[in-house]
Amino acid sequence: MYSVLLNPSNTEIYSFLTERIYRELVVIFATCKVNYKGRAESVASESPRLIILKPDGTVIIHESVKREPLNWQPPGTKIEIMNDYPLKIVAQRKRPKEVIEIDLKEVFYITSAEVKDGDFVIKGREIDIVNTIIQNPSMIEEGFVPLTREYNTPYGKIDLVGLDKKGNFVIIEVKRSKAQLSAVSQLYRYYLHIRETKEDKVRGILVAPDLTTHARELLQKLGLEFIRYDIQKYSSY
């Protein structure tokens, strides 16, 4: 559920905010003046700004540029609505002692909504790429069979080990971003170690969205292979 007030009066603003702060996410677009007192002091003159009041006490004030807010207060902030003229929002915390006072000169709109926390899953990590390969081994090549992940060596853990259709041992090093020379060198250390301990032929494959020119040259020189991983293509897996 959500509510919207367009060009509200001071009485409407006061009633709306006092009923909803700490209960709903409130967004205000208004011409306002902002005073800050705390570890320093600042005054932001009258200008149109976006003000966000979150149920956990977070207060954020945005202007038209930059990602960072003009001012903000963290969760746990005490928020009060002062029925003065102009109407004032006071956001205060004790440790450290900081106060933001927002004088609402002209409010164009206010919205509020019951916002719930959903699941948050980061995809595109190297472990996610390894999981995708295990679920879709043909993305390496037809006939590839994954055997072991996190294979221990004296030089670190190999991301994934498997066999190709000819029975050759395949070691795979995964990178979530453009692979550098260091990734090729790491793969080659694994390759040399496995080649010394296995009688079978060994292949080394670097899996990444891309790699640098120098990394590609070294990869080819060392007889290793590269497979491009399309993060967008496989993000649904």
From Swiss-Prot:
EC number of the protein: 3.1.-.-
Organism domain of life: Archaea
Location in or out of the cell: Cytoplasm
Natural source organism: Saccharolobus islandicus (strain L.S.2.15 / Lassen #1) (Sulfolobus islandicus)
Keyword Nuclease: yes
InterPro entries noted in UniProt: Endonuclease_NucS, NucS_C, NucS_N, NucS_N_sf, Restrct_endonuc-II-like, tRNA_endonuc-like_dom_sf
Family, as annotated: Belongs to the NucS endonuclease family.
Name under which the protein is recorded: Endonuclease NucS
A GO molecular-function descriptor: single-stranded DNA endodeoxyribonuclease activity
Signal peptide positions on this chain: none
One cellular-component annotation, GO: cytoplasm
Lineage of producing organism: Archaea, Thermoproteota, Thermoprotei, Sulfolobales, Sulfolobaceae
Role played: Cleaves both 3' and 5' ssDNA extremities of branched DNA structures.
